[in-house]
Swiss-Prot record:
Keywords of this entry: Antiport, Cell inner membrane, Cell membrane, Ion transport, Membrane, Potassium, Potassium transport, Transmembrane, Transmembrane helix, Transport
Function summary: Transport system that facilitate potassium-efflux, possibly by potassium-proton antiport.
NCBIfam families assigned: 2a37 (TIGR00932)
Any one GO biological process: potassium ion transport
GO CC field: plasma membrane
Protein encoded by which gene: kefBC
Domain of life: Bacteria
GO terms of molecular function: antiporter activity; monoatomic cation transmembrane transporter activity
Name listed for the protein in its UniProt record: Glutathione-regulated potassium-efflux system protein
UniProt source species: Haemophilus influenzae (strain ATCC 51907 / DSM 11121 / KW20 / Rd)
Record-stated family: Belongs to the monovalent cation:proton antiporter 2 (CPA2) transporter (TC 2.A.37) family.
Membrane-spanning segments: 6-26, 32-52, 55-75, 94-114, 118-138, 152-172, 186-206, 227-247, 274-294, 298-318, 336-356, 362-382
Localization terms from the record: Cell inner membrane
Length: 618
């Protein structure tokens, strides 16, 4: 039986089984999902059970998770916002990387006895925090979109940029660096700049036409394929240019941040991002050489303690120098005190160039992994310290955070942007209410641009698209689409996922109305009925009937129709109810008999009377 089992499939099953058992356990214990992934990877890696013998291949594949994560972050960074963050990126980011690098380099030289070159590589590798761990931590705490979270992200962006000159410095530190020529360096810089410019041009002028073309085909999987093409293509372009793949994905995300397709892209990428990011953390855990740890545990713990303490101190000092308060400085310190995945790239390049030995590479890599293992624990300790001085009242909050809170007020999510929804949106905007709209029709999106509405391309029937569009922040949802099946499907999903979220919708027929009433939809406007009632009132008044009397007649019709609707809701869809209520019947008995004015009408009416007589006898 075991001979028939596919060993590769067996590894995949074990990977999934270990993650779905260990990660929720660590999450429940309050240690975070990242530590759970790292421990799960360590257990199935070559140092423990040996189920996966080549963790490097897993890490290389799973790096795409980090790439996709940066793409999603880029989607939330409008170019204007990124420009507004330039001081934080090149100011606080440069200061933090510079001070951390200097402090750790000198610590390695004078406290660990390393050579200048080796100490520089080790110190700068540890200076670069793990983008994956920091972003995951921010997301779990709901801080990604806050001002504090944005300031952390700005530093991460600079660290992603810093890997480029650090890799270039390896060539100068190498024993045979004299062989490199200035011409070669300028060519490398030219290729890198060309990759960046090419990516920006592609994102600005080619991306939107591409997705408009794909959307017209109305093939959902093609949108997913297009999203993956954008992310992986951008990553490949940057890698060819000698830059970070994650940086390429981030730039692509920023270029698409103002596109009407951004929420659809985010929804399509999200499942791949989550799985691959978890796999990345497991791959890092697999890479930990426990034999090296046990043989040199005193040295490793000394390196980890020294570097974490040094980096944490530098992060805190820079935060305070740049006028961040004590609580935020501690939060940044706990988030960024560890080493990151870029250290593996730097150590590998340095070992290849013979700047550091293979033994030193293995030792420094193990130290970085151990620091990543400690990261969730450090964050937990820091969180408890912060909670002691957490503001209890709204007036104590950071004034920049108040902008985030205000943005969530009076937010309405409208699904469908036809003529019906356009009128609804204009009414809301006159009152100053924030409106977000989802539509999958390209022409509707183009029309919306003339009104200045926030309209995004996406299928409102997909819950992941709704989440990406901000349904969790919405005060209510308005359904303006004209497809009754899609209306019922959307309502069913939202009632299950967000039972307390008010839903207001339009309907065309009684059957859909009855179904939505049973699902406790908050408000239903029946277009046919309301249009007919309005026209009836106008007709009565045009015939000279007093307005008060006309209103009384309309009120009576509404009452009789409501009684009929209540019975339809109560008794369901039996044949008797359909026959009794869903065939047109007058609310009250006509005062005069029906008269046929031509022969054809007389034949039709006679057939109808015979049918009713036979039904009564049966």
């Amino acid at each position: 039986m075991s001979q028939l089992a596919n060993p590769e499939l067996m590894k995949v099953v074990i990977l999934l089984a270990s993650s779905v058992t260990i990660v929720p356990l660590f999450k429940r214990l309050g240690l975070g999902s990242v530590l759970g992934y790292l421990v799960a990877g360590c257990l199935i890696g070559p140092s423990v059970f040996g189920i996966v013998q080549e963790p490097t291949a897993v890490v290389h594949l799973a790096e795409l998770g980090v790439v996709m994560f940066l793409f999603i972050i880029g989607l939330e960074m409008y170019p204007e916002r990124l420009w507004a963050m330039r001081k934080a990126i090149f100011g606080r980011g440069l200061l933090q990387v510079g001070l951390c690098g200097c402090l750790l380099t000198f610590s390695g030289i004078y406290l660990l006895g390393l050579t200048k070159e080796v100490s520089f590589i080790a110190g700068m590798g540890f200076t670069l925090s793990s983008t994956a761990i920091v972003m995951q931590s921010l997301e779990e705490r709901g801080l990604t979109s806050t001002s504090k979270g944005q300031r952390v992200i700005s530093t991460l962006i600079f660290e992603d940029i810093a890997i480029v000159p650090l890799l270039a410095s390896v060539a100068f530190l190498a024993p045979h660096s004299k062989e490199a020529t200035p011409h070669t360096d300028w060519v490398s810089i030219g290729i890198a700049l060309s990759a960046v410019v090419g990516l920006i041009v592609t994102g600005k002028w080619l991306m939107n036409p591409l997705f408009r073309l794909i959307s017209k085909a109305r093939i959902r999987e093609m949108m997913t394929a297009g999203a993956l093409l954008v992310v992986l293509g951008a990553a490949l372009a940057m890698e060819i240019g000698g830059l970070s793949m994650a940086m390429g994905a981030f730039v692509a995300g920023v270029m698409m941040s103002e596109s009407a397709f951004r929420h659809q892209l985010e929804a399509d990428i999200e499942p791949f991002r989550g799985l691959l990011l978890g796999l990345f953390f497991m791959g890092v855990g697999m890479s930990l050489d426990l034999h090296l740890v046990f043989n040199h545990w005193i040295l490793l713990l000394g390196i980890v303690f020294l570097y974490i303490l040094g980096k944490a101190s530098a992060v805190y000092i820079i935060a305070r120098i740049t006028r961040l308060d004590h609580r935020e400085a501690i939060g940044r310190m706990s988030l960024m005190a560890h080493g990151g995945e870029f250290a593996f790239v730097l150590f590998s390049a340095a070992a290849t160039a013979e700047v550091i030995s293979n033994e030193e590479q293995a030792t420094f890599t193990a130290a970085v992994i151990i620091s990543m293992l400690f990261s969730p624990i450090i964050a937990q300790i820091a969180r408890k310290l912060i909670q002691r001085t957490e503001p209890k009242h709204l007036d104590q909050l950071d004034e920049n955070d108040l902008d985030t809170i205000v943005d969530l007020e009076d937010n309405v999510l409208v699904i469908g942007f036809g003529r019906f929804s356009q009128i609804v949106c204009q009414t809301l905007l006159i009152r100053g209410i924030s409106v977000s709209v989802i539509d999958r029709n390209i022409e509707n999106i183009r029309a919306a641009a003339k009104f200045g509405f926030k309209v995004y391309y996406g299928d409102g029937i997909r819950l992941d698209v709704l989440r990406a569009a901000g349904i969790e922040k919405a005060k209510c949802v308005v359904l303006g689409i004209n497809d009754t099946q899609r209306i019922e499907h959307i309502v069913s999903q939202m009632k299950e996922a967000y039972p307390n979220l008010p839903i207001l919708t339009r309907t065309y027929d009684r059957k859909t109305t009855v179904s939505l009433i049973k699902q406790d939809v908050d408000f239903i406007v029946r277009e046919t009925f309301e249009s007919a009632i309005t026209l009836s009132r106008a007709t009565l008044m045009k015939l000279g009937i007093d307005k008060i009397e006309a209103e009384e007649i309309i009120k009576e019709v509404r009452t009789l129709d409501q009684e009929r609707l209540n019975e339809e809701v109560l008794h369901g869809f039996s044949n008797e109810i359909v026959k009794k209520y869903w065939t047109p019947r007058p609310f009250i008995k006509p005062h005069l008999d029906t008269k046929a004015l031509n022969k054809e009408t007389e034949e039709i009416l006679s057939e109808k009377i015979e049918e009713e007589i036979s039904n009564d006898h049966s």
